[in-house]
Amino acid sequence: MVPKLFTSPICLLLLLGLMGVEGSLHAKPRQFTWAQWFEIQHINMTSGQCTNAMLVINNYQRRCKNQNTFLLTTFADVVHVCGNPSMPCPSNTSLNNCHHSGVQVPLIHCNLTTPSRRISNCRYTQTTANKYYIVACNNSDPVRDPPQYPVVPVHLDRVI
């Protein structure tokens, strides 16, 4: 007997398990809006060294993130990019809320080299470059995001 797709309890548990894993990898901490989380992950490099800077992000997510890119620019400058023409997002072409920076910015890419269950033991290498970037933008949270920004970056889709 072959179980029917999505009606079998086993298939349902597998599907829910996969969704849970996927969701946890892309989840933001509840206390932040998507724009605030974007700023923490991609603008606010609290230290010039990836290992120290990633500790902030990893503490919120309670795991060592495999890689991350910090744009060495201001949140206001990235918000300005949201005003550039919309384009399909390279990582998901069904979404049309991405915007190309139009100018290169300095950035630091952090790559996990020493994973650990203990967040403070995770180690990263870093690479610096000047690159264009593509961000996804959405309407801001009218209560929790700065009122001067009606549209805000919510996802760093790609660096080029």
UniProtKB/Swiss-Prot annotation:
Keywords: Disulfide bond, Endonuclease, Glycoprotein, Hydrolase, Lyase, Lysosome, Nitration, Nuclease, Signal. Its EC number is 4.6.1.18. Substrate binds at residues 65-69. Glycans are attached at residues 34, 44, 92, 111, 138. Residues 1-27 form the signal peptide. GO terms for biological process: chemotaxis; defense response to virus; innate immune response in mucosa. It is found in: Lysosome; Cytoplasmic granule. It catalyses: an [RNA] containing cytidine + H2O = an [RNA]-3'-cytidine-3'-phosphate + a 5'-hydroxy-ribonucleotide-3'-[RNA]; an [RNA] containing uridine + H2O = an [RNA]-3'-uridine-3'-phosphate + a 5'-hydroxy-ribonucleotide-3'-[RNA]. It is an enzyme of class 4 (lyase). Disulfide bonds join 50-110, 64-122, 82-137, 89-98. GO terms for molecular function: lyase activity; nucleic acid binding; ribonuclease A activity. Gene3D superfamilies: Ribonuclease A-like domain. One of its GO terms (cellular component) is extracellular space. The modification 3'-nitrotyrosine is found at residue 60. It holds the Pfam family RnaseA. Interacts with and forms a tight 1:1 complex with RNH1. Dimerization of two such complexes may occur. This is a non-secretory ribonuclease. It is a pyrimidine specific nuclease with a slight preference for U. Cytotoxin and helminthotoxin. Possesses a wide variety of biological activities. PANTHER family: NON-SECRETORY RIBONUCLEASE (PTHR11437:SF62), RIBONUCLEASE (PTHR11437). Belongs to the pancreatic ribonuclease family. This is Non-secretory ribonuclease. The gene is RNASE2.
